[in-house]
Amino acid sequence: MFGKAGLGGLMKQAQQMQENMKKAQAKLAETEIEGEAGNGLVKITMTCAHEVRKIDISPDLIQEAADDKEMLEDLILAALKSARDKAEETANKTMGAFTQGLPPGVGDFFR
């Protein structure tokens, strides 16, 4: 199916793709995304590798939530989910560019 030169070229392309994907993954690990809830009263900053870097809770919310711990917990959870979803979307867009046009499952070989 492939000649020696063709197979060698294909392997070289695969290695280059793998290197490029590793660079993209490293960049994503440093890319910060912000999720929020309660119209910005709770903000969470995380990387596309799901490392939470910062949680910001409005002082107004802290005073308001003094009597409603459950509301504060719900807002933190919602902001965390928002950040996670944005991180996943960003990572999928970035990594999807490498596997576009490949048969399903083949892109997993390069991860």
Swiss-Prot record:
The keyword Cytoplasm applies. Keywords: Cytoplasm, DNA-binding. InterPro entries: YbaB-like_sf, YbaB/EbfC. It is found in: Cytoplasm, Nucleoid. GO terms for cellular component: bacterial nucleoid; cytosol. GO terms for molecular function: DNA binding. The keyword DNA-binding applies. Gene3D superfamilies: Nucleoid-associated protein YbaB-like domain (3.30.1310.10). Homodimer. PANTHER family: NUCLEOID-ASSOCIATED PROTEIN YBAB (PTHR33449:SF1). Binds to DNA and alters its conformation. May be involved in regulation of gene expression, nucleoid organization and DNA protection. Belongs to the YbaB/EbfC family. This is Nucleoid-associated protein NMA1657. It comes from Neisseria meningitidis serogroup A / serotype 4A (strain DSM 15465 / Z2491).
